[in-house]
């Protein structure tokens, strides 16, 4: 990111997100009423981004708690939708949601301790950045 995750400004941003947008272990996109009314759903991809931020800021235990919590909302196949209804836990919106699953995977890799490794690039991929 443009700021180190342990920077005090990032930590205060993470705290504000947790205080104002986290409900039942999930993160809402926003809480302001719009053309559709007052939001009642969390936004799944934001939840995984929030967990990443927690982990990178050094709050690894809390990040893992949030991660384990959000996994409880997947369906019987482990799939997620774009949104989760905060009142019922129902998966709503686009289903299955590709961006959510991409974020789920990157968060799982990060929390496993493998996320800090630099990717190994194959020499035939000229556009790839080679590790130092």
Language-model segments: which ranges?
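Extended glycan-interaction surfaces of carbohydrate-active proteins
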Residues: 1-43, 65-116, 120-132
């Amino acid at each position: 990111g443009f700021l180190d995750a342990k920077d005090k400004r990032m930590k205060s941003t993470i705290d504000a997100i947790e205080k104002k947008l986290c409900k039942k272990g999930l993160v809402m996109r926003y809480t302001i009423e719009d053309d559709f009314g007052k939001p009642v759903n969390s936004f799944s991809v934001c939840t995984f981004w929030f967990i990443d931020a927690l982990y990178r800021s050094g709050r690894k235990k809390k990040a893992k708690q949030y991660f384990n919590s959000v996994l409880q909302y997947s369906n019987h196949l482990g799939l997620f939708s774009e949104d989760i209804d905060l009142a019922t836990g129902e998966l709503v919106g686009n289903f299955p949601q590709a961006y959510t699953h991409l974020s789920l995977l990157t968060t799982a890799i990060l929390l496993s301790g493998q996320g800090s490794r630099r990717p190994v690039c194959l020499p035939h991929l000229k556009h790839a950045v080679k590790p130092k």
